[in-house]
Amino acid sequence: MVMTDPIADFLTRIRNGNMRKFDVVEAPASKIKRQIAEILKAEGYVKDVEYVEDNKQGVIRVFLKYGKNGEKVITNLKRISKPGLRVYVKSDDIPKVLNGLGTAIISTSTGVVTDKVARETNVGGEVIAYIW
Protein backbone atom coordinates (compact mmCIF):
# COMPACT_ATOMS: atom_id res chain seq x y z
CA MET A 1 0.00 0.00 0.00
CA VAL A 2 1.33 3.42 -0.96
CA MET A 3 1.42 6.09 1.72
CA THR A 4 0.29 9.41 0.23
CA ASP A 5 1.09 11.62 3.23
CA PRO A 6 3.95 10.32 5.40
CA ILE A 7 4.00 13.48 7.55
CA ALA A 8 0.33 13.02 8.47
CA ASP A 9 1.09 9.37 9.28
CA PHE A 10 3.95 10.45 11.56
CA LEU A 11 1.79 13.01 13.38
CA THR A 12 -1.05 10.49 13.69
CA ARG A 13 1.29 7.93 15.25
CA ILE A 14 2.35 10.52 17.84
CA ARG A 15 -1.27 11.58 18.46
CA ASN A 16 -2.47 7.98 18.85
CA GLY A 17 0.45 7.03 21.10
CA ASN A 18 -0.23 10.10 23.22
CA MET A 19 -3.93 9.21 23.58
CA ARG A 20 -3.03 5.64 24.62
CA LYS A 21 -0.25 6.97 26.91
CA PHE A 22 2.53 5.02 25.22
CA ASP A 23 6.10 5.76 26.28
CA VAL A 24 7.63 5.36 22.80
CA VAL A 25 6.29 5.76 19.27
CA GLU A 26 8.19 4.51 16.22
CA ALA A 27 7.87 5.69 12.62
CA PRO A 28 9.85 5.29 9.39
CA ALA A 29 12.52 7.99 9.17
CA SER A 30 12.88 10.81 6.67
CA LYS A 31 14.68 14.14 6.74
CA ILE A 32 11.54 16.24 7.30
CA LYS A 33 10.25 13.87 10.01
CA ARG A 34 13.57 14.18 11.81
CA GLN A 35 13.33 17.97 11.68
CA ILE A 36 9.74 17.89 12.98
CA ALA A 37 10.75 15.53 15.80
CA GLU A 38 13.66 17.81 16.76
CA ILE A 39 11.27 20.79 16.91
CA LEU A 40 8.91 18.80 19.16
CA LYS A 41 11.86 18.03 21.45
CA ALA A 42 13.17 21.62 21.46
CA GLU A 43 9.70 23.01 22.26
CA GLY A 44 9.29 20.55 25.15
CA TYR A 45 6.45 18.45 23.72
CA VAL A 46 8.43 15.18 23.81
CA LYS A 47 11.17 13.84 26.11
CA ASP A 48 13.63 12.61 23.54
CA VAL A 49 14.08 11.60 19.91
CA GLU A 50 16.25 8.69 18.78
CA TYR A 51 17.28 7.61 15.28
CA VAL A 52 17.83 3.93 14.59
CA GLU A 53 19.59 3.07 11.36
CA ASP A 54 18.66 -0.15 9.61
CA ASN A 55 19.38 -1.39 6.10
CA LYS A 56 16.43 0.56 4.74
CA GLN A 57 15.43 4.12 5.57
CA GLY A 58 15.80 3.96 9.35
CA VAL A 59 13.37 4.46 12.22
CA ILE A 60 12.59 7.47 14.40
CA ARG A 61 11.75 6.73 18.03
CA VAL A 62 9.85 9.51 19.78
CA PHE A 63 9.71 9.28 23.58
CA LEU A 64 6.46 10.91 24.67
CA LYS A 65 6.25 13.20 27.67
CA TYR A 66 3.60 13.34 30.39
CA GLY A 67 3.08 15.49 33.49
CA LYS A 68 3.49 14.43 37.13
CA ASN A 69 -0.06 13.07 37.37
CA GLY A 70 0.00 11.49 33.91
CA GLU A 71 -1.58 14.45 32.10
CA LYS A 72 -0.69 14.81 28.44
CA VAL A 73 1.82 17.46 27.38
CA ILE A 74 0.53 17.34 23.79
CA THR A 75 -3.16 18.26 23.75
CA ASN A 76 -3.49 17.93 19.99
CA LEU A 77 -1.56 17.79 16.71
CA LYS A 78 -3.20 18.98 13.53
CA ARG A 79 -1.89 18.62 9.97
CA ILE A 80 -2.57 21.86 8.08
CA SER A 81 -0.98 21.68 4.63
CA LYS A 82 -1.98 18.43 2.93
CA PRO A 83 -1.01 16.95 -0.45
CA GLY A 84 -4.42 17.89 -1.89
CA LEU A 85 -4.47 21.41 -0.43
CA ARG A 86 -1.15 23.08 0.28
CA VAL A 87 -1.21 26.03 2.68
CA TYR A 88 1.45 28.72 2.27
CA VAL A 89 1.87 31.91 4.31
CA LYS A 90 3.87 35.08 3.86
CA SER A 91 6.19 36.19 6.63
CA ASP A 92 3.70 38.79 7.88
CA ASP A 93 0.76 36.31 7.86
CA ILE A 94 2.32 33.58 10.02
CA PRO A 95 -0.43 32.28 12.33
CA LYS A 96 -0.31 32.17 16.12
CA VAL A 97 -1.64 28.91 17.52
CA LEU A 98 -3.97 29.52 20.50
CA ASN A 99 -2.71 33.11 20.80
CA GLY A 100 0.89 31.96 21.19
CA LEU A 101 0.31 29.00 23.55
CA GLY A 102 0.75 26.45 20.75
CA THR A 103 3.34 26.04 18.02
CA ALA A 104 3.07 26.11 14.24
CA ILE A 105 5.65 24.10 12.30
CA ILE A 106 6.57 25.80 9.03
CA SER A 107 8.72 24.53 6.18
CA THR A 108 10.72 27.50 4.89
CA SER A 109 13.59 28.01 2.47
CA THR A 110 15.92 27.89 5.50
CA GLY A 111 14.52 24.57 6.75
CA VAL A 112 11.71 23.42 9.02
CA VAL A 113 11.21 25.94 11.84
CA THR A 114 8.64 27.05 14.41
CA ASP A 115 6.34 30.01 13.88
CA LYS A 116 8.40 32.10 16.32
CA VAL A 117 11.65 31.52 14.43
CA ALA A 118 9.95 32.20 11.09
CA ARG A 119 8.63 35.53 12.42
CA GLU A 120 12.06 36.50 13.81
CA THR A 121 13.86 35.67 10.56
CA ASN A 122 11.06 37.21 8.47
CA VAL A 123 10.49 34.18 6.22
CA GLY A 124 7.26 32.52 5.11
CA GLY A 125 6.60 29.04 3.85
CA GLU A 126 4.34 26.01 4.00
CA VAL A 127 2.43 25.49 7.26
CA ILE A 128 2.98 21.81 8.07
CA ALA A 129 1.17 21.42 11.40
CA TYR A 130 -0.16 23.00 14.57
CA ILE A 131 0.70 21.60 18.01
CA TRP A 132 -0.82 22.61 21.31
Curated annotation (Swiss-Prot):
Keywords: Ribonucleoprotein, Ribosomal protein, RNA-binding, rRNA-binding. GO terms for molecular function: rRNA binding; structural constituent of ribosome. It comes from the Bacteria. GO terms for biological process: translation. The keyword RNA-binding applies. InterPro entries: Ribosomal_uS8, Ribosomal_uS8_CS, Ribosomal_uS8_sf. GO terms for cellular component: ribonucleoprotein complex; ribosome. Gene3D superfamilies: 3.30.1370.30, 3.30.1490.10. Belongs to the universal ribosomal protein uS8 family. Part of the 30S ribosomal subunit. Contacts proteins S5 and S12. One of the primary rRNA binding proteins, it binds directly to 16S rRNA central domain where it helps coordinate assembly of the platform of the 30S subunit. This is Small ribosomal subunit protein uS8. It comes from Lactococcus lactis subsp. lactis (strain IL1403). The lineage of its organism: Bacteria, Bacillati, Bacillota, Bacilli, Lactobacillales. The gene is rpsH.
